[in-house]
Amino acid sequence: MYSGYNHYNRQKSSTGTTIIDPNSAWFAQEPHWPLIEDLLGGTYQMRSRHRKYLPQEVRELDESYDNRLARSVCPPYFVRLERMMAGMLVRKPVRLNDTSDDIRLHMFDVDLEGNDLNVWTYETARKMIRYGHCGVLVDAPAAGQAGRPYWITYTPREILGWRTEMIDGKLKFTQLRLLEKVFEPDGLYGEKVVEQVRLLTPGAYEIHRKGKNNEYVKFDEGTMSLPEIPFAVAYSNKINFMESRPPMADIAELNLKAYQLQSDLSNQLHISSVPMLAFFGFPQSSEEVSAGPGEAIAFPAEGRAEYIEPSGNSFEAQFKQIDRVEKQINELGLAAVLGQKLSAETAESKKIDRSQGDSTMMVIAQQMQDMIDNCLMFHGQYLGSDGGSCFVNRDFVAQRLEPQEIQSLLQLYTAGTITQETLLTQLHEGEVLGDEFEVEEEIEATESGGLREISEPIEEADESMPEQPADE
């Protein structure tokens, strides 16, 4: 039977009997992850998978395959595109609105790992774009213990299962299982990785670790100060609740194809770049003929020797095929995300493509914004303060206002058609004012006399002029 069926028709679900067993949604998503995860590891990771991504040809010796594998380099198209898309969201800092001062202070180290809100948003957006969605747990020390809330990001691979109920008109988690890895000291200098499952229920948690019989047993438990599970989710390509597909899976497949094509071309160029010396006219019964420096060859009457090398016509076709794959990657990446194509097109089609591309990124930005809003809400509930809301950048391409546009805004403000707040907001979004500029603070400063008026200098009397006598 064809062995490929073992991969494409593999088990999609299992009967969950232990706390470590994933649910059916996890099994439905898992086949889409390995290629993307291996591409993130770069050339070293792709080489370590050897025949999985770079097949060994029929009658190709193992030694020849190892040499070909060592010369193969995986181009980083997928990784660069993922970084570019995530970077668009934080091209301008995430803006907080109506957030209390203590929470704003926590946003400078949102995950207790030294990452501020913008860096955390960038890394979380990469995971969301990579897998299709991700979740964030707003955790905090138990009541009475020192510490403050912090945010932990989980990928779909680490979300093993969940249960939900409709409570007060909202779908809320009643059970959540999260896979974690923690590092613990091992001896004087070493460390070991411990795999554990965090089981969350409203107001409580349990930690389960693998025991001596390879069965997970309860290691720790406790209560949480919130009556619900503080877990927020954001999607980039939603299929069902807590289920998604990687939005760039097609680009990952094209990246793999480019890796294989470049490997084939590099191997053929390596072999054919050295011409082969051929001898003609020697009888088959003659001894083996060799040529080299300091050697003389006695040719038969009709014998001759010449170098044979390929014409290179097939190489041109392979180069063109690689160019076509790279063009497909550029068009899928730039056109679908930014609405820009490298090929020629009409102005109207550019507008349509731009709106579609912006809509794709708009959904990602809106999902990220909603998730941060929910995390701020949970964060505020822990502290008993107002979490407020946020605004995630939607200006994905740098577009600085032109001088004519700035002049038009100033004329509208002078005529009283727009307010000072509208003027400053447009100048700030148009990148005329810096990222650190705060519109509300500027308005308050001007209204309270923050702009100091410089008094006119007092003219000093000229000492050379005699004083005029006072009138009697």
Task: Set out the residue ranges of the language-model regions.
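Extended, helix-rich architectural segments
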Residues: 1-151, 459-472
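Short secondary-structure junctions and interdomain/linker hinges
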Residues: 88, 92, 96, 114-120, ...
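Short amphipathic alpha-helical segments
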Residues: 104, 112-121, 128, 250, ...
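Short secondary-structure capping micro-motifs at structural edges
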Residues: 120-124, 313-317, 359-360
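Extended, regular secondary-structure scaffolds
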Residues: 129-238
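Residues in well-ordered beta-strands of folded domains
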Residues: 137, 177-179, 298, 391-395, ...
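Extended, charged amphipathic alpha-helical segments
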Residues: 215-348
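C-terminal helix-loop subdomains that flank or include functional centers
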Residues: 317, 324-472
